[in-house]
Amino acid sequence: MDALATVTYPGTKKNLVESEMVADNLRIDGMKVSFSLIFPRDTDPFMKSTIKAAEAAIHYHVSKDVEVTIEVETKSKPRPEAGKMLPGVKNIIAVSSGKGGVGKSTVAANLAISLARLGYKVGLLDTDIFGPSMPKMFGVEDFRPYAVHKDGRDLIEPVEKYGVKLLSIGFFVNPDTATLWRGGMASNALKQLIGDADWGELDYFVLDTPPGTSDIHLTLLQTLAITGAVIVSTPQKVALADACKGIDMYRNDKVNVPILGLVENMAWFTPAELPENKYYIFGKEGCKNLAKEMDVPLLAQIPVVQSICESGDDGKPAALNVDTMTGQAFINLAISQVVHSYNMRSEKSLCVL
């Protein structure tokens, strides 16, 4: 038991013994040890890593020759059914891109912060299981969410920074190690971050989705009632082609999620010493033309400036400084989301009437 007391369960500050995860069936027969670990749910994404950590602790603190057998037990109050999750959330906005590297996560982070600065209650979920970036962008890489007991369930308490409630798989995995999970395991981890977290009452729940279209997107669409999607792209033709695929995915008859609009990131380059100059290094008005072609609003054009890159790396997103050109651009983007989401709710109300 002393060896197991050195293993901490992810998402809590307690070890396996304190968390009462070690069942009372511990048996020691010479160099053989067997017992059960009790997990909150049978789809727990940290089950395998916790079992391996328990085995390693016994081998380290007792003997490497000990034969360890660990069984799994689960006991939990059922997670809410799909579609009934997050009843306290008014609007769910998916920020997507057809291609990686276009600044989607930057847009999602700054959108969430801008909405919070406008006085709204905001949550942000980093749904990129294989490449989480939000802990770095918010400067909270060393933070660890803890568990709270609420309504008969153990829930994950989101990290809060800049007025935004934040969760990411990046809080629970080694940032220097690749996440080698099959699609089903990744989807289960995502569902846990959604349904097993204490998000509370939110005006806006922003989803930073992985690039492209994948199992993660299908899980989100099947699990949540998404208000609308924001598509991020650069003006480049190769990025615009993939942005079209993203729009088509949300417009699919089986999905039917409204497109709130397009955001053109890296629209032009503006050097700090010449703020009036614009250099269209990735093409000019590609998203503007695509928005017209696809009949969707162009929500914002975000320039390439050194401060955006530096602010993301430093954990202080550009939206924190509304006196800058980029900070104001993100505030305007947030305002447009408020207007569009209000219009969406109004249209639904009219349909009901």
What role is predicted for each listed range?
Residues 115-176:
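Phosphate-binding loop that captures ATP/GTP phosphates
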Residues 52, 203-204, 210-310:
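Conserved catalytic-core segment of NTP-binding enzymes
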Residues 4, 22, 89, 100, ...:
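Residue-level signature of catalytic and energy-coupling elements of molecular machines
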